[in-house]
Amino acid sequence: MTIILKPGSVPLETLKKIYREGLPVRIDPAFHAGIEKAAARIAEIAAGDAPVYGINTGFGKLASIRIAAGDVATLQRNLILPHCCGVGEPLSENIVRLIMALKLVSLGRGASGVRLEVITLIEAMLEKGVIPMIPEKGSVGASGDLAPLAHMTAAMIGEGEAFYRGERLSGAKALGKAGLKPVVLAAKEGLALINGTQTSTALALAGLFRAHRAARTALITGALSTDAAMGSDAPFHEEIHQLRGHKGQIDAGRALRTLLEGSAIRRSHLEGDQRVQDPYCIRCQPQVDGACLDILRQAARTLEIEANAVTDNPLVLSDGRAVSGGNFHAEPVAFAADQIALAVCEIGAISQRRIALLVDPSLSFGLPAFLARKPGLNSGLMIAEVTSAALMSENKQMAHPASVDSTPTSANQEDHVSMACNGARRLLQMTANLNAIIGIEALTGALGVELRKPLTTSAELAKVIAALRAKVATLEEDRYMADDLKAAAELVADGTLSGVISAGILPDLEA
């Protein structure tokens, strides 16, 4: 199956499919005429006498230097190679595929001035599985993601490196093995390819998709913890949340209420419970998780716009002029990444407090210490809770906003930058930490519910426990725990736990 992209109106769901499923993509042929028209206009400008940035001039601080018409193609090649300054581990294949798809969307709007053969090469590389080797670090998020996108472009011109069928090869060899030929860049094409926010945006989208799946699962584990602790579902009453009015809170409250529906554990303490109120980590879940859902949705709107944007420079406008602007500045992406980081941090923080509640016999309303069946002889989930605290703390440290950390670059020509790529890239580690925290809560919540037998939980939560137990056996006595924690985190990350819940209960990214 090939995804057909309509540049300017590619929805979030399509971007998610590209990221998760690695499907090949193509630009809708209806956009080809606009692409070719802009390319023809760039060719005219390159042949003319008027200096236009990036077409017949140098770059950045060297923009005042005029380039002769005979050197325009050499200029584009020379632009790519010294910009390949990335460091660190290669970005994963699914991230690079998303970067390339986003670049197609941007170029496909017909304002960048690249020829159709540049578009078709990217499409063919995605179809045949030629994945440029892009190091993870090196972009400040203005002027676009220059270093990472230069590594992408290097593979296209037969330089740099690329992965093909699991092998890391030179760009030329990877293209050759796939039956493809390198492109010879024409005027402005190198600049159009490396100038843009596609790396930052792809990383932020990956963080968003991972964070949203974790947020949905955190509502499930939060409901499990509520039942395990014999908490009240009264704070999830719909009218409470309607009176405040925040959409995320309303949706989170509804999800928690529905997940707990029919629990025999809940019915058992409706009368005669001496506790007047539960701790905040139980009672305020709709307020906290709902606020996180709201900012994830706001970030999603920003990133969907950015994914469809033209972010190189200069741009060919509708009147045929090539005009320099600043769409390459990734401040919107940086802000979105910072928002996602805050949500990830807070979802993990309140989840960790519920884990701590369940292992503490002074708070868990009758559960044994650390959920060990023979406390003292067994330590139960004592150190699993400590691990969750370590992960929570690391996420707090990483949640500092990257967008406020501008520094001048390129001899002060590029004197304010977004740091969007740094802000987006850290989301991969933060969401991995969050998956592990929520996985630990799944283990504590499920075990806490099991320790309430013969009382049973709701039908929805019983499905979650069954999915967990298919991979992780219930804890009867102390055993090696690292494999349990890894398996539980994977069930969060791959959507297994959220996938067993009936449709319509868990909130979507689109409000």
From Swiss-Prot:
Top-level enzyme category: lyase
GO cellular component: cytoplasm
One Pfam family named in its UniProt record: Lyase_aromatic
UniProt EC number: 4.3.1.3
Catalytic activity: L-histidine = trans-urocanate + NH4(+)
Subcellular location, principal: cytoplasm
InterPro entries: Aromatic_Lyase, Fumarase/histidase_N, HutH, L-Aspartase-like, Phe/His_NH3-lyase_AS
Superkingdom field: Bacteria
UniProt PTM: Contains an active site 4-methylidene-imidazol-5-one (MIO), which is formed autocatalytically by cyclization and dehydration of residues Ala-Ser-Gly.
Annotated GO MF terms: histidine ammonia-lyase activity
Keywords: Cytoplasm, Histidine metabolism, Lyase
Record PROSITE patterns: PAL_HISTIDASE
Name of the featured protein: Histidine ammonia-lyase
Gene source species: Brucella ovis (strain ATCC 25840 / 63/290 / NCTC 10512)
